[in-house]
Amino acid sequence: MENILQNDWGPLLGPEFEKEYYQNLANFLKEEYEEHVIYPKVEDIFNALQYTSYENTKVVILGQDPYHGPNQAHGLSFSVQPGIKTPPSLLNMYKELRDEYGYEIPNNGYLVKWAEQGVLLLNTVLTVRQGEANSHKGKGWEHFTDRVIELLNEREKPVIFILWGRHAQAKKKLITNTSHRIIESVHPSPLSARRGFFGSKPYSKVNTILANMGEREIDWEIPNL
């Protein structure tokens, strides 16, 4: 799997692939992919890191584990493949975006446009069994994605971390470099969005920070497909 990382994440994360926890994880995944339906496809597991290189990462939106329905997950947190109905949390993200910028809600949940602009759409667990949320929790992915966050924390150039909900906010302890910025609220899930996600203006906050740093702002508008 380490050969998949073809950009600057490769040498940074290379040592992880040699560690015992990752060897155990790789063995577990081999069996899981052989015996069960696992999402995303093997070739999509590291898409977040593929689309958004270490040096190009401006923003991190931290998710939990991949969508576990057919053909949804493709390696980017909150994003779904073209032709798949937009999930409820992402729909709420779009509603907040509409309220902030006036953008129409698109007919898809394909967030590659964000990833290509430097928004790292990272789940803390990168695989899941079909229909079984959190089924790959505690198998080693958390060590790996914690290392991703630690590496970004070590970077001199500031990163904006968007932490929605308690699960994401638990990673705040890894962000110790005071040059980085943290934007947090409750999760956009329908269960919590009205308790402080709606009206939190995360997208314009990101762009204000980027503009103040002299960086290109993110074009958050997702086009219809």
From Swiss-Prot:
Catalyzed chemical reaction(s): Hydrolyzes single-stranded DNA or mismatched double-stranded DNA and polynucleotides, releasing free uracil
Family of this protein: Belongs to the uracil-DNA glycosylase (UDG) superfamily. UNG family.
Gene: ung
One matching Pfam family: UDG
NCBIfam families from the UniProt entry: PRK05254.1-1 (NF003588), PRK05254.1-2 (NF003589), PRK05254.1-4 (NF003591), PRK05254.1-5 (NF003592), ung (TIGR00628)
PANTHER family: URACIL-DNA GLYCOSYLASE
Keyword DNA damage among UniProt keywords: yes
UniProt-listed Enzyme Commission number(s): 3.2.2.27
Subcellular localization: Cytoplasm
Function: Excises uracil residues from the DNA which can arise as a result of misincorporation of dUMP residues by DNA polymerase or due to deamination of cytosine.
SUPFAM superfamilies the UniProt entry points to: Uracil-DNA glycosylase-like (SSF52141)
Protein's UniProt name: Uracil-DNA glycosylase
Superkingdom of origin organism: Bacteria
UniProt keyword list: Cytoplasm, DNA damage, DNA repair, Hydrolase
CDD domains: UDG-F1-like
Residues at the active site: 65
Organism listed in the record: Bacillus mycoides (strain KBAB4)
GO biological process, any: base-excision repair, AP site formation via deaminated base removal
An MF annotation (GO) of this entry: uracil DNA N-glycosylase activity
Gene Ontology CC terms, in alphabetical order: cytoplasm
The keyword Hydrolase belongs to this UniProt entry's keyword annotation: yes
